[in-house]
Swiss-Prot record:
Protein species of origin: Staphylococcus aureus (strain JH9)
GO CC annotation terms, alphabetical: plasma membrane
PANTHER family in alphabetical order: UNDECAPRENYL-DIPHOSPHATASE (PTHR30622:SF3)
Membrane topology: Multi-pass membrane protein
Protein name: Undecaprenyl-diphosphatase
Amino acid sequence: MFIIELIKGIILGVVEGLTEFAPVSSTGHMILVDDMWLKSSEFLGSQSAFTFKIVIQLGSVFAAAWVFRERFLEILHIGKHKHVEGENDQQRRSKPRRLNLLHVLVGMVPAGILGLLFDDFIEEHLFSVPTVMIGLFVGAIYMIIADKYSVKVKNPQTVDQINYFQAFVIGISQAVAMWPGFSRSGSTISTGVLMKLNHKAASDFTFIMAVPIMLAASGLSLLKHYQDIQIADIPFYILGFLAAFTVGLIAIKTFLHLINKIKLIPFAIYRIVLVIFIAILYFGFGIGKGI
């Protein structure tokens, strides 16, 4: 049984790595895969299972931090500046990089404030199957609207052309995504596209903005719940973290490579299908009624 439970931990890490930064809602998938199927709370205990989810989320966040490590160093004026997307050598020499630490901080402020104010309320009252389904569906519609609008925008902006107002509005949408199932990346990428960024630029800024705030939030949660970690459960934490980190690296790089080509509608359609599937399990078979 121990081996089977380890495999379950790895599966949850893989799911987290695949979905945390994709616009499909990692919360929705964790409810489907864990709460409705694998039920980590049954072999880890409810408190330890909650802490396990924090740890595997950190695996995904560290993956994003690694992918954007050079950009973070540049923002902090530590690394070498790389070329700006879409600009030639002369333009690069004459025009400084525009994305800076203030952009990131401006984008983080709304979610940071609302997170401090409402995190406990959201965790207590909004983490249920019906509310997650609502978030998945409404978020999908928002993504479709953003994609439909994007075809009308000529010469969409790159991430280095973002201004502070755009950063702030995208940050507000990150706060809206605190509703479980809405998806942080789905919300912020869609808003970025509506603010006339291209899909890759909106994704880049989404991930850059998300890493510090998610590190802070997950780190704080881990400090609150570290006493729930049992020595016997450490192998689950390690394997889950490594699975989330490894799969997260692959998923993030693949997503960034493809997003300007495939855009958001395929993810929106997938979310709607996922809502239907979860609804059948929940309303038709009563699976997850206790969540």
